Amino acid sequence: MASTSDIRNGLCIRYNHDIYKITEFLHVKPGKGPAFVRTKLKSVTTGKVLDNTFSAGHKIEEIRVETHKFQFLYEDGEFWHFMNVEDYTQIRLTENALDMPKLIKEGEVVTILINTEDNMPLSVDMPASVVLEVTHTEPGVKGNTATNATKPATVETGFEVNVPLFINEGDKIKIETDKGTYKERIKE
């Protein structure tokens, strides 16, 4: 059993008969009253996000996990299929296990958390950002750059993101995977 002082981002815990991954936390010590920890918990089974507050010293059940590198193979409409790069075993995951499934392109290597108790995959840790090619966007209008105007663009995986007006079809852009937002254009 762990306590609230052990809480950190990425920690997997069992709470209310489900397994959650801590995505955000904040230790709060008010001037009056006991300390507590505010957390955002993401269910690894349903994908739902839960805001929860633990009082200081509260005992939590930590889930032991291992990390393994997997290569994304393909998506068949219902499942995303991955192959372990060490022993070539394949697993399939539902969309709930992936934070931003439309940002993974075929052949990309990601880290998957696996529960050591039952060897079940829990979640996929994406890289901080990915580089994708813009396949469709409207042309930018000259003289419309006085403000930070954006336009929608579709990238090679089908994900839609708002980009600045100077981005054209065929450009490679970097997208932050945690929020799914445009970061920068990649020059070749």
From Swiss-Prot:
Keyword Membrane applies: no
Predominant location category: cytoplasm
Keyword set includes Membrane: no
InterPro entries per the UniProt record, alphabetical: Elong-fact-P_C (IPR015365), NA-bd_OB-fold (IPR012340), Rib_uL2_dom2 (IPR014722), Transl_elong_fac_P/YeiP (IPR020599), Transl_elong_KOW-like (IPR013185), Transl_elong_P/YeiP_cen (IPR001059), Transl_elong_P/YeiP_CS (IPR013852), Transl_elongation_fac_P (IPR011768)
Keywords, comma-separated and alphabetical: Cytoplasm, Elongation factor, Protein biosynthesis
GO CC aspect terms: cytoplasm
GO biological process, one term: peptide biosynthetic process
Gene Ontology molecular-function annotations: translation elongation factor activity
UniProt cross-references to CDD domains, sorted A to Z: S1_EF-P_repeat_1 (cd04470), S1_EF-P_repeat_2 (cd05794)
Protein localization: Cytoplasm
Recorded metabolic or biological pathway in which this protein acts: Protein biosynthesis; polypeptide chain elongation
Family of this protein: Belongs to the elongation factor P family.
HAMAP family attached to this UniProt entry: EF_P
Function: Involved in peptide bond synthesis. Stimulates efficient translation and peptide-bond synthesis on native or reconstituted 70S ribosomes in vitro. Probably functions indirectly by altering the affinity of the ribosome for aminoacyl-tRNA, thus increasing their reactivity as acceptors for peptidyl transferase.
Protein name: Elongation factor P
